Amino acid sequence: MARVKRGVTKHQRHKKILKLAKGYFGAKSKLFRPANEQVIKSLAYAYAHRRQRKGDFRKLWIARINAAARMNGINYSRLVNGLKKAGVEINRKMLADMAVNDQAGFNRLVDIAKEKLGLGA
C-alpha cells in the first residue's frame, strides 16, 4: 500500500480548530494544542449550558412572578396553587411576562387565585 501523507489534511484540521479558537487569550488562540484543548472544553461548556439555560430562565420567571404576587399580598406558591385550582392553565413564561408588561391582567389573575383559595379579593 502507498504511504499516506497527512500534510494537507493536518493543515486543514489545524486551521479549523484555530478558527474556532479565535478571540481566546494568548497561546489558546495561536498554538494548536492549547487551542484544541480549549475548543473541546468550550464546546462541552456550551452544550451543558444550553441545557442549564432552560432552568435559569425558569428561575428568573419564578422570581418575577413572586415579586409581582407579593406586591398583591400573596406569595408565588399560593398564587400558582390558586390558579391551578381555578383551572387557569398559563405557563410561567407568560405569567412572568404579564407581571412585567400587563399588570392589570396579572392583578386579575391574582384576584382569581385569591377567590379560589378563599383569601378574599
UniProtKB/Swiss-Prot annotation:
GO terms in the biological process aspect are: ribosomal large subunit assembly; translation
Name the keywords, alphabetized: Ribonucleoprotein, Ribosomal protein, RNA-binding, rRNA-binding
- Keyword presence, Protein biosynthesis: no
| InterPro entries the record matches | Ribosomal_bL20 (IPR005813), RIBOSOMAL_L20_CS (IPR049946), Ribosomal_protein_bL20_C (IPR035566)
Protein family (similarity comment): Belongs to the bacterial ribosomal protein bL20 family.
Summarizing the function annotation, the protein's role is:
Binds directly to 23S ribosomal RNA and is necessary for the in vitro assembly process of the 50S ribosomal subunit. It is not involved in the protein synthesizing functions of that subunit.
Q: What is this protein called?
A: Large ribosomal subunit protein bL20
Source organism of the structure: Moorella thermoacetica (strain ATCC 39073 / JCM 9320)
